[in-house]
Design a protein with these regions (language model features):
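Active-site mouth loops of central-metabolism enzymes
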Residues: 30-41, 75-78
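Amphipathic, non-transmembrane alpha-helical secondary structure
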Residues: 41-44, 48, 52, 85-88, ...
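Glycine-rich, proline-tolerant flexible connector loops at the mouths of alpha/beta enzymes
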Residues: 59-83
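N-terminal amphipathic alpha-helix/helix-capping segment at the start of soluble metabolic enzymes
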Residues: 2-24
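Catalytic domains of carbohydrate-active enzymes, especially glycoside hydrolases
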Residues: 45-65
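Short, well-ordered coil/turn segments that N-cap beta-strands
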Residues: 20-23, 55-56, 92-101
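Conserved small/polar residues in nucleotide/adenosyl-binding loops
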Residues: 104-106
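Alpha-helix-loop-beta-strand connector modules within alpha/beta enzyme cores
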Residues: 76-99
Length: 106
C-alpha cells in the first residue's frame, strides 16, 4: 500500500517544523490591504480561514518591498516596520491552526 504523501505529515526541509500535509495556498492577488499596504482585518481573517480549513502553508498576496514598488491599490506592503504588527498578528493566527506563513514579494 502506498503512502498518501499529500495528506501525511512531513518535516519542512532545513527546519524542525512538521507540517500536517503538503497543501499550499498559492499567492493570489486579492487587493484587500489598506492604502498604506498594511493588512486589513478582512484579509487576515480570509487567510486564517484557509489555514483553519487545512492548508499547511499560506502564501500571502504579492507584496511590495519599497514604496515605489507598489503596483496596485490594495497591494500588501512589507516595506517598513509599520507593517510588522499586522504581519505578526497574521503569522500568529496562521500558526494557531498548525500552518505556516510564506511571504511573496514582487
Amino acid at each position: 500500500m502506498s503512502e498518501d504523501i499529500f495528506n501525511s505529515e512531513f518535516l519542512l526541509a532545513g527546519t524542525n517544523k512538521v507540517l500536517r500535509n503538503r497543501s499550499v495556498l498559492a499567492a493570489l492577488t486579492n487587493k484587500q490591504s489598506n492604502d498604506d499596504g498594511s493588512l486589513t482585518e478582512e484579509e487576515i481573517k480570509w487567510l486564517e480561514r484557509r489555514a483553519h480549513d487545512g492548508f499547511a502553508i499560506i502564501t500571502t498576496a504579492a507584496a511590495f518591498v519599497h514604496p515605489s514598488g507598489k503596483s496596485w491599490s490594495g497591494e500588501l506592503g512589507v516595506h517598513s516596520d509599520e507593517m510588522l504588527p499586522g504581519l505578526i498578528d497574521l503569522a500568529g493566527r496562521i500558526n494557531s491552526h498548525g500552518a505556516i506563513l510564506s511571504l511573496i514579494h514582487i
